[in-house]
Amino acid sequence: MAQADIALIGLAVMGQNLILNMNDHGFVVCAFNRTVSKVDDFLAKEAKGTKVIGAKSLKDMVSKLKKPRRVILLVKAGQAVDDFIEKLVPLLDTGDIIIDGGNSEYRDTTRRCQDLKAKGILFVGSGVSGGEEGARYGPSLMPGGNKEAWPHIKTIFQAIAAKVGTGEPCCDWVGDEGAGHFVKMVHNGIEYGDMQLICEAYHLMKDVLGMRHEEMAQAFEDWNKTELDSFLIEITANILKFQDTDGKELLPKIRDSAGQKGTGKWTAISALEYGMPVTLIGEAVFARCLSSLKEERVQASRKLKGPKMVQLEGSKQAFLEDVRKALYASKIISYAQGFMLLRQAATEFGWTLNYGGIALMWRGGCIIRSVFLGKIKDAFERNPELQNLLLDDFFKSAVDDCQDSWRRVISTGVQAGIPMPCFTTALSFYDGYRHEMLPANLIQAQRDYFGAHTYELLSKPGEFIHTNWTGHGGSVSSSSYNA
C-alpha cells in the first residue's frame, strides 16, 4: 500500500539523521539500504517508535510510495549514484522524482538531469550541508535540476531545513541542472578558505604573540561576539580549550597534516576553467597539500633558515585586534571571489541564480554559517546586479576600516617568517582589483614578441595589433610559440 511521502536510500549516519528529521516534521519515510540488514537494525534501534517504514527491495520501496514518487539517494558520489538510478528507472513512472543528496560533481548532475528528462523522470541534485548534526536538526539544502520537481519537494525540504531570522528556511530552489551541486561545491571551497584563514590567525597568535591556549580560546570567544560571529570561530575556541585525559591541551598533539576530500580542489579547478581569480580558495587547498608533506618539512626545518626573531612593535592587545581585522578583511575577499565564480558559472551555463538567496541558504545549518552571510544577503537585496561584493557600500567601508590592520599583520608576519598564504593572497587580490592599470601590458608585449599573439591599444580597444619587435626590443624574432 502506498503510504510513504518519500524514500531515502543509504543508511549511513547522514541518511539516518535526515530520515529522523523528516519524521519529526510529520512525513512518512521509507528507508532502504543495499545491505538490507541495516534497514532492520535502523527500524529496531534509532527509528524505533517512529512512523518510518522499511523496504526489503527497491521494488518493495517503490510500491510503498505515494505519487509522484520521491526518492532521495544518499550514497557515495560517482558510480554508486548511476547504479541506483539505472535500477530505479524501470520501476518509476513519468513525473516521478529522484534526488541526489550526495557530494556529486556538478557536471554529473547535469548529465543525469538530461538523461532522465528524456525518460520522463525529474532529477534533482541537492547540496546538503551541516554534517550529521545538521542532517538531524536542520541542514542547509541547495536543490537544483529539473524545476518541475520543486513544487513536489519544496514542502518537505523547507520543513526540514535550518531556520534563521523569523523562521526563514535555509533552502530554496537554486537553478537548473547542476546549479545546486555547483553552489554546494563553492560552499565547500569557501569552507576551506575560512578554515585556513582561522589557522593563520592561530599561527600568528601562537608564534608572534606567544599566547597560551586559554588566551587564544578567550580571544576567539571574544571575536565570536563581533562581525566574525560564526560556527567555525565558535568551535575553534572550544578546540583550543579542549584537554586530553592527561589534563593537557589536545591540539598541540595532533599531527599537522590536513586531509581533504576534494571539493575544495574542485572549486579551484572550476575557477581556473572559467578564468576567475578565486585565489584564496586555491591557496587554502595548496596549504593543505603543503601540510601533508610532513616528513619533508621536518627535514627542511633542520636545514632552511628563517629570519631572526623580530620584536613586536606596540602592544600585544593592539596587534591581536589587527589580526582580527585582517581575518575579517580576508574573509570578505574570499566570499567576494566565491560569488564571482558563481556569477561566471551562471553566465557559462545560462543559470539564473539568486545570490542573496544563496547567502541566506548558507546563513544557517551549514559549516560556514555566520552572521556575516546576512550582510551578503542585504548587499544583493540592495543591488541584485551587484558585480562584486567589494563594490557594495557596506563591504567597501568594512575593508577600508580593516585595511591598515591588514597590512600591518602581513608585514609583521612576513618579517617573522610566518606562512600566511590566504592573508597575503587576499590582500594581493584586493590591491590588484583596485588598480586601474596592472603590468599585464608587459605580458601582452612579451607574448606578441615571442609568439605574435597580438595586443590591443588602450586607445583602440577591439583592434588587435602585431608588432615586429626585432631591432627595438632585442634580436629575438617572433615565433608561433604559445604561452
UniProtKB/Swiss-Prot annotation:
The modification N6-acetyllysine is found at K38, K59. It is found in: Cytoplasm. This is 6-phosphogluconate dehydrogenase, decarboxylating. GO terms for cellular component: cytosol. The keyword Aminoacyl-tRNA synthetase does not apply. It catalyses: 6-phospho-D-gluconate + NADP(+) = D-ribulose 5-phosphate + CO2 + NADPH. Homodimer. It comes from Rattus norvegicus (Rat). Coiled coil: none annotated. Pathway: Carbohydrate degradation; pentose phosphate pathway; D-ribulose 5-phosphate from D-glucose 6-phosphate (oxidative stage): step 3/3. The lineage of its organism: Eukaryota, Metazoa, Chordata, Craniata, Vertebrata. Keywords: Acetylation, Cytoplasm, Gluconate utilization, NADP, Oxidoreductase, Pentose shunt, Phosphoprotein. Substrate binds at N103, S129, G130, G131, H187, N188, Y192, K261, R288, R447, H453. GO terms for biological process: D-gluconate metabolic process; NADP metabolic process; pentose biosynthetic process; pentose-phosphate shunt; pentose-phosphate shunt, oxidative branch. NADP(+) binds at residues 10-15, 33-35, 75-77, 103, 478-481. PROSITE patterns: 6PGD. Belongs to the 6-phosphogluconate dehydrogenase family. Its EC number is 1.1.1.44.
